């Protein structure tokens, strides 16, 4: 499925290729995936943007060639009752690092870089913020092992809640308010599917 889908975004700055899971590219997979989500999550709606004909996308495939930075996937509709995001690894190795702090505003990338903080997002782009920062220094051993791609000062006040070690054949379901990032443990590339949901 992934290989047959058209490229949606080729972000050379983040070094990531994104493809939307369009409906009807593989109707069998569409049915299996959507019915399994309903079985696990109960009543929900997709929150992955829509096609030109108004159909929901089932998620976003992301092929990363560099670790993604500290961010949150809360979406861009302040009136939506956001629910869960589902991360499905398609290759190994890889990790997603989740932090204890939550975020309840729009999708945001967290940075202590003053130039980056002046970024003015277009519709559908992450805001920038340093409001995640606290006073306590981040654990140096944890930084060296998992987060060496992030300035340790940009992790001040943060505490790791969970490190999800990617395993093909699994899906991780978490609240969308979790601040998270990729780990620096990357073997050339990382490929996964992320699906965002909201309450009906």
Predicted regions and their residues:
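Non-heme Fe(II)/2-oxoglutarate
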Residues: 1-59, 65-67, 102, 109-134
């Amino acid at each position: 499925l992934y290989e047959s889908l058209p490229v949606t975004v080729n972000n050379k700055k983040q070094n990531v290729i994104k493809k939307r899971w369009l409906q009807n590219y593989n109707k069998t997979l569409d049915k299996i995936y959507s019915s399994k989500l309903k079985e696990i999550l109960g009543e929900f709606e997709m929150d992955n943007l829509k096609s030109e004909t108004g159909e929901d996308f089932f998620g976003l495939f992301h092929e990363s060639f560099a670790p993604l930075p500290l961010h949150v996937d809360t979406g861009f509709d302040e009136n939506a009752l956001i629910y869960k995001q589902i991360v499905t690894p398609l290759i190994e190795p890889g990790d997603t690092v989740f932090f204890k702090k939550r975020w309840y505003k729009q999708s945001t990338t967290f940075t202590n870089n003053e130039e980056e903080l002046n970024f003015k997002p277009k519709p559908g782009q992450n805001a920038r913020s340093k409001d995640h920062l606290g006073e306590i220094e981040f654990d140096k051993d944890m930084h060296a092992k998992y987060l060496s791609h992030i300035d340790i000062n940009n992790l001040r006040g943060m505490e790791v809640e969970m490190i999800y070690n990617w395993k093909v054949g699994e899906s991780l379901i978490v609240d969308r308010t979790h601040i998270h990032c990729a780990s620096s443990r990357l073997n050339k590339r990382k490929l996964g599917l992320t699906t965002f949901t909201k309450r009906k």
